[in-house]
Amino acid sequence: MAGAMRKMAVYLGLVEDDGYDGRGFDPDDDFEPELDPEPERDRRRHEPPHQSHQALHPQRDESVRVVQPPMQRDPVPHSASLPAESVRPARIAPVASITQERQSLEKNAPVIMPKVVSEREPYRITTLHPRTYNEARTIGEHFREGTPVIMNLTEMDDTDAKRLVDFAAGLVFGLHGSIERVTQKVFLLSPANVDVTAEDKARIAEGGFFNQS
């Protein structure tokens, strides 16, 4: 209210306006006292630099998240994880020792000789002329010694001849030999270890051995 009355007094010239600065006065304008900028500038001039900087740029109250890099583990050397035996270089045997060892093995190895088939052993065929069955013992002894026997039964009767043939068949069977009929009453008894040739069998058939005893 006092301000309005002062404005009116100034307008009527009753009161001198101390703050008149030569500008036009409009009674309708709201009167706002002007602040002197000088004290503010003086205050800023005397303030320390960091305070003025803080006043101009206020510090933001924000939490800054610091991201720490992950911890790095020290690399483990490869040589530490490997056993000592694997790190050692392989020993290479000298060529000379390998050659000597091979020669020693070849020398000690048994030598396998090929089996040589021996030539047919010579044999002598015995011709017997039994007259009775009692001579069967003589036939058995020659045959058991490995001698081929020509059994000529032409001088025996049929009954004794038949009995002697049965004996010869049993003898050959027991000693793993063979019996062959040459003629009606002539038989060849061959031991297991003797192979009578075809030429000798032909001669027997022709009667070449009949006279041997």
UniProtKB/Swiss-Prot annotation:
Biased composition (Acidic residues): 27-39
GO-annotated cellular components: cytoplasm
Region: Disordered, residue numbers: 16-63
Gene3D superfamilies to which the protein is assigned, alphabetical: SepF-like protein
Domain of life, source organism: Bacteria
Pfam families: SepF
Chief subcellular location: cytoplasm
Intracellular or extracellular location(s): Cytoplasm
Alphabetic keyword roster: Cell cycle, Cell division, Cytoplasm, Septation
InterPro entries in the cross-refs: Cell_div_SepF, Cell_div_SepF/SepF-rel, SepF-like_sf
Biological function: Cell division protein that is part of the divisome complex and is recruited early to the Z-ring. Probably stimulates Z-ring formation, perhaps through the cross-linking of FtsZ protofilaments. Its function overlaps with FtsA.
The protein's name in its UniProt record: Cell division protein SepF 2
Species: Streptomyces avermitilis (strain ATCC 31267 / DSM 46492 / JCM 5070 / NBRC 14893 / NCIMB 12804 / NRRL 8165 / MA-4680)
